[in-house]
Curated annotation (Swiss-Prot):
Gene source species: Oryza sativa subsp. japonica
EC number: 3.4.22.34
Site location (Required for post-translational maturation and enzyme activity): C269
Keyword Transmembrane helix recorded: no
Full protein name: Vacuolar-processing enzyme beta-isozyme 1
Broad class of the protein's primary localization: other
Alphabetical GO biological process terms: protein storage vacuole organization; proteolysis involved in protein catabolic process; vacuolar protein processing
Length: 497
């Protein structure tokens, strides 16, 4: 009983910030200029101009890779982000054959979806799911397939449509990723995770193949700056922006209890702060006039949440910054319907946001509240909350104890949390990092998306020269009595590395 009371108190505290936003009026309004084929409106006949050709104005072809790196209805927002991005590119004239979409595709037809067969990315937005190609779904959404697609390697792709980025030297590439992350890693619904060291090598290989002119990458994830900090060369003709710096969270938005709140039948967040910022900017601006730098500055301002960085994050930029003056249409296309707009965005300012890592708990709690009476489903929902929080506490305590065993009881916590100075990569040896993660998970259970935040701890263990044998001994001592069957890497789909 005491444990259950603690769980309730934890979740209630988690929801307090979002709940405080209820009842407040937002200023401004959201006026999407994109219309889905199924949407009707007074100006439907006026929105008829045909999309611009993908190769117009500069001689090359536009390519795009869109990745939603999660699964499960509690992560609704990531697939909503990616579907929305697809609609923007498609309206901009980027051909479907040149857009590769990775998404698990378990949201639109999920039993919990109050509007079956549709996905929305804004409380007042229309369906963004219609027409999105199913290139790589379910078990095909993997790091290996993503790398193969980016490199244009058709023989290395497993399953899916087989579509790859078959780009030429004069072409432009846009990559957008949305999911959970941690220091040096990005999530994938099928393990292992995407590790920064591997990603940078793939980008270098793509550049060496002379198969593109310029590339722009947008990444939505916690600690997403750590994927590129100290690693991203400036001579690859690749410009990157990330939702957060190397040491902070990114944030979900349009969540239950926020303003603007999703329709009452939705029990999960509809979008992510950085992602909706760039997309709502793109669809309300003339991308033949707006530059890459213009969008970066606008998104940075909005994502900081009016500089309330306890509920916002620092948008960062990496790589080659010499072509920021290029117009966005080179990467995202140009929607002729936006040709005469004034480049002024009126957006509703969220009164609160939800930490990416806690958004799943918000969903679980809203699901519990939605169920009536004392049904078996409601009890099962409560047990899921209890199990999830208990495993989080286990991860917290076991990592802390391992640090004390390895570095001493006095120095352990500080040694694990130490962040390197700006400009340095997270870890010197990425293979070591992966080995330490596997050792930990073999004894202590899966890290899960919550435990991704401890990648810096494993990196510091490597950077301090701790041996695999010592890490194994510490992990056994920390977790020897823990029944990890529920959270075994085998149960969770494999190791994170």
């Amino acid at each position: 009983m005491a444990a259950r009371c603690w769980v309730w108190g934890f979740v209630v505290a988690l929801l307090a910030v979002a709940a405080a936003a209820d009842g407040e009026e937002e200023e401004g309004k959201w006026e999407p200029l994109i219309r889905m084929p199924t949407e009707e409106g007074d100006d439907a006949e006026a929105a008829a101009p045909a999309p611009a050709p993908a190769a117009a104005d500069y001689g090359g072809t536009r390519w795009a890779v869109l990745v939603a790196g999660s699964s499960g209805y509690g992560n609704y927002r990531h697939q909503a982000d990616v579907c929305h991005a697809y609609q923007i590119l498609q309206k901009g004239g980027v051909k479907e054959e040149n857009i590769v979409v990775f998404m698990y595709d378990d949201i639109a037809h999920n039993i919990l979806n109050p509007r079956p067969g549709t996905i929305i990315n804004h409380p007042k937005g229309g369906d963004v799911y219609a027409g999105v190609p199913k290139d790589y779904t379910g078990h095909q959404v993997t790091t290996e397939n993503f790398f193969a697609v980016l490199l244009g390697n058709k023989t290395a792709v497993t399953g899916g449509s087989g579509k790859v980025i078959d780009s030429k030297p004069e072409d432009h590439i846009f990559i957008y990723y949305s999911d959970h992350g941690g220091p040096g890693v990005l999530g994938m619904p099928n393990l292992p995770y995407l590790y920064a060291g591997d990603f940078i090598k793939v980008l270098q290989k793509k550049h060496a193949s002379n198969s593109y002119s310029k590339m722009v990458i947008y990444v939505e994830a916690c600690e997403s700056g750590s994927i590129f900090e100290g690693l991203m060369p400036e001579n690859l003709n690749i410009y990157v922006t990330t939702a957060s710096n190397a040491v902070e969270n990114s944030w979900g938005t349009y969540c239950p209890g926020e303003e603007p709140s999703p329709p009452p039948e939705y029990i999960t967040c509809l979008g992510d702060m950085y992602s909706v910022a760039w997309m709502e900017d793109s669809e309300t601006h003339n991308l033949k006039k707006e530059t890459i730098e213009d969008q970066y500055e606008l998104v940075k301002k909005r994502t900081s949440n009016a500089n309330k960085l306890n509920e916002g994050s620092h948008v960062m930029e990496y790589g080659d910054k010499t072509f920021k003056d290029e117009k966005l249409f080179l990467y995202q296309g140009f929607n002729p319907a936006n040709g005469n707009i004034t480049n002024e965005l009126i957006w509703p300012v969220p009164k609160a946001t939800v930490n990416q890592r806690d958004a799943d708990l918000l969903f679980m709690w809203k699901r519990y509240e939605q169920l009536n009476g004392v049904s078996e489903d409601k009890l099962r929902a409560l047990r899921e909350i209890e199990d999830t929080i208990a495993h989080r506490k286990h991860l917290d305590s076991s990592i802390d104890f391992i640090g004390k065993l390895v570095f001493g009881f006095e120095n352990g916590p500080l040694a694990l949390e130490a962040a390197r100075s700006s400009g340095q990569p997270l870890v010197d040896n990425w293979d070591c990092l992966k080995k330490m993660v596997r050792i930990f998970e073999s004894q202590c259970g899966s890290l899960t998306q919550y435990g991704m935040k401890y990648m810096r701890a494993f990196a510091n263990i490597c950077n301090n020269g701790v041996s695999e044998a010592k890490m194994m001994e510490a992990s056994i001592n920390a977790c020897g009595r823990y029944n990890s069957a529920r959270w075994s890497p085998m149960t969770e789909g494999g190791h994170s590395a």
